[in-house]
UniProtKB/Swiss-Prot annotation:
Function, in words: Probable phospholipase that hydrolyzes phosphatidic acid.
SMART domains: DDHD (SM01127)
Family from the record: Belongs to the PA-PLA1 family.
Alphabetized PANTHER family for the sequence: PA-PL1 PHOSPHOLIPASE FAMILY (PTHR23509), PHOSPHOLIPASE C1020.13C-RELATED (PTHR23509:SF6)
Record keyword Protease present: no
E.C. no: 3.1.1.-
Active site: S400
Subcellular location: Cytoplasm; Nucleus
Keyword presence, Cytoplasm: yes
SUPFAM superfamilies: alpha/beta-Hydrolases
One annotated Gene Ontology cellular component of this protein: nucleus
Superkingdom, taxonomy of origin: Eukaryota
Protein name as annotated: Probable phospholipase C1020.13c
């Protein structure tokens, strides 16, 4: 039993959030179904929330809105706004019920469940606690005096609290009415740590509850103290080494709501897969010890309105200048037919991207992507100052037409950018991009349309790193690269990947856009990490359940020196390609460019979605374009490629471009 004291006892305050996922589980997709429950913030975040709360109530904090926020979670992706007691995503807009969560400052909790008392009731309990001051009562002395028939005025400890009060009167004094008063409910404070929420009137005779340790009163017990866990293993968000920014396509249907929601949802799922694969691979010697990836969506689409019309200019041919003439304005949704929704969704949200991007909307699309990416990066840099100090790397993932938009931006991006403020320019990213991953994009179509090839940017690429000097020569003819940022297809990146599902109707190969002749001898690399499956259908359809063993390029070279065969993932049946003539100079240039654009000497990577025993490629194509976000193989590929040790020597042998045997005219073989 606690000793009585004239001073209020020290209590541990515990903050909670109402959610169906765990902020401290980095593998959570944040899109779980099921009922929400109260979860506690771990000590690091809990202390930060309580400190900020005390600053606000004592007016020691700035009145700026951002100064009343606290970043929380193992990944630091969410923020608690203390005035509103809500938890929201920090880097992307809230678009679903799982995005905006309720937060409570747990000063009082239910003794039976350990859950916090809701804010309104907690405030009433605390108001009564401060008025009654139950911690100042010594119940042992009161009851002892009652039994011995002594005058309570002889005891100064009781006099100081309630002079000339009998034990019955003291019990009444320890009660505090709860609003609304018509309900008859009240709280009975037993001491400085425990109280009972009780029913008044006739209901008190029929109520079932816990009996007070002091009197015959029954009620629901609540306590003003939470258990403190000395070490919960969380010491703040992890320090990220590699940041992925994901840019989506246009997506016309319901763009203001569903499109934005679906995009953030798929990013949450893919982030979860990346974290799972990182944990699986963390003991692999090929992966850097400090590797810590993070993925953020770039939600640029909700800033644009494609249903807006260009205001007619006086004198335009074909324009009716009569102000009384009312234009007939309609949107895509107005002319869309309701039949075959799955197919029309693909056509409406994907296929229509290309004509939209080729219209007058192109410039506004590019600026919107740049503006949102710069905003997210600027916020990331402010919240994670260590990222620049540790020279963190940035990778961009572009999906569908989003890859084409990013391709346009990186073609006009300066080779290197200096730190500028977010308002300085909307023409380029305010950060340097280390690598660009194209997911199912029609980039090849636009290269063909512009009659341009992919060419390395001078000063970027594999050859600029000292660690690669034994594998690629940096002293090459000027024609091998392009010096400037005014050429379509010349990207300001060090590595470029074109990844596609082989059933994706939108995706295109890009190896031929570097050199058509040379690309005929290169197979696209298959992304394949076969694992044991829990599905009977997958076990039947995939006979090989042994995981693929990864090896570095350097290990393979060493094995070749020792005359040991190099085991690689089988790609396609070997073919021979007949060329008219063998141009050694062109072949050498193409080989150098492929190595410069990607340390694997390969741009094209293909994967296959998991199917059962029976599958139809024409039906599968409807889901193939969105299959990237649920592919474990693709997530593992990104982890390996961005998490492996630096340099060509440490590139993965299975991912390197493989050349088919070729026969040239004039060969004697």
């Amino acid at each position: 039993m606690q000793e009585s004291s004239q001073e209020e006892p020290v209590h541990y305050v515990q903050w909670f959030y109402l959610s169906n996922y765990d902020l401290y589980d980095e593998t959570s997709s944040m899109e779980l179904t099921g009922a929400q429950s109260w979860r506690r913030f771990l000590n690091y975040d809990n202390n930060a929330l309580e400190a900020k709360y005390n600053e606000i109530i004592t007016e020691e904090v700035s009145q700026e809105p951002n100064q009343k926020n606290v970043i929380v979670g193992i990944s630091g992706l969410h923020v608690v706004n203390l005035p509103t007691l809500t938890l929201k995503p920090l880097y992307w807009p809230s678009a679903s019920k799982n995005d905006t969560l309720r937060v409570v400052r747990g000063l009082w909790m239910y003794e039976d469940t350990g859950l916090p008392v809701i804010n309104e009731l907690s405030d009433m309990l605390e108001e009564g606690y401060q008025e009654v001051k139950p911690y100042a009562v010594n119940w042992d002395n009161v009851l002892k005096e009652e039994e011995e028939g002594k005058d309570s005025q002889d005891d100064p400890s009781v006099l100081s609290h309630k002079r000339n009060k009998s034990s019955k009167e003291l019990i009444d004094a320890m009660q505090w009415p709860l609003k609304p008063t018509s309900s008859g409910k009240y709280v009975f404070y037993e001491d400085g740590y425990r109280a009972l929420i009780c029913q008044g009137g006739l209901l008190s005779y029929f109520s079932k509850g816990t009996q007070s340790r002091r009197t015959s009163i029954k009620g629901m017990p609540v306590v003003r103290d939470f258990p403190y866990f000395e070490d919960d293993g969380f010491n703040g968000p992890k320090q990220v080494t590699d940041l992925f920014l994901v840019v989506h396509g246009i997506g016309q249907k319901r763009s203001e709501t569903e499109e934005r929601f679906l995009f953030t949802k798929t990013c949450n799922v893919f982030r979860s897969l990346i974290q799972i694969q990182k944990n699986i691979m963390k003991e692999d010697p090929l992966i850097r010890n400090d590797y810590e990836p993070q993925l953020l969506p770039i939600c640029w689409r909700n800033k644009l309105n494609f249903n807006s019309y260009i205001k007619p200019v006086a004198g335009d041919e074909g324009r009716v200048e009569d102000e009384e003439f009312e234009e007939n304005r309609f949107s895509i949704e107005d002319i869309e037919i309701d039949s075959i929704p799955a197919v029309r969704r693909l056509l409406g949200d994907v296929m229509s991207d290309i004509p939209y991007y080729m219209s007058h909307h192109k410039e506004s699309i590019i600026k919107s992507v740049i503006r949102e990416a710069n905003r997210v990066y600027h916020l990331w840099k402010d919240c994670n100052p260590y990222f620049l100090e540790n020279k963190g790397r940035i990778f961009i993932i572009g999906h569908s037409l989003g890859s084409t938009v990013v391709f346009d931006i990186l073609s006009l991006q300066p080779t290197f950018v200096k730190e500028i403020t977010i308002d300085d320019d909307e023409s380029c990213f305010i950060f340097d991009t280390n690598g660009f991953f194209c997911f199912g994009g029609p980039v090849g179509f636009f290269l063909h349309l512009n009659q341009q090839s992919i060419i390395p940017r001078r000063g970027r690429g594999s050859s600029r790193y000292e660690i690669n000097k034994n594998f690629i020569n940096s002293d090459v003819p000027k024609s091998y690269t392009y010096d400037g940022y005014d050429r379509y297809g010349c990207l300001a990146v060090d590595s470029f990947y074109n990844i596609y599902n082989h059933l994706d109707p939108v995706a295109m190969r890009l190896n031929p856009t570097v050199d058509l002749s040379f690309s005929k001898g290169i197979h696209p690399t298959r992304i394949l990490f076969t694992r044991k499956s829990s599905s009977i259908l997958r076990m039947i359809s995939h006979s090989n359940t042994d995981p693929v063993e990864l090896r570095s390029y350097n290990q393979s070279l060493q094995q070749n020196k020792n005359n040991e065969p190099t085991a690689v993932v089988p790609l396609e049946p070997e073919q021979t390609v007949e060329l008219e003539t063998r141009n050694f100079r062109r072949e050498e240039r193409a080989k150098w460019r492929m190595q410069e654009l990607n340390e694997n000497s390969q741009l094209d990577y293909v994967f296959t979605s998991a199917h059962g025993v029976i599958s139809n490629k024409y039906l599968s194509m409807l889901s193939a374009h969105s299959s990237y976000w649920s592919s474990e193989d693709l997530a593992c590929f990104l982890v390996v490629e961005t998490g492996r040790n630096f340099g060509i020597a440490n590139s993965i042998e299975q991912f390197r471009g493989k050349h088919m045997p070729r026969i040239f005219k004039g060969d004697s073989s």
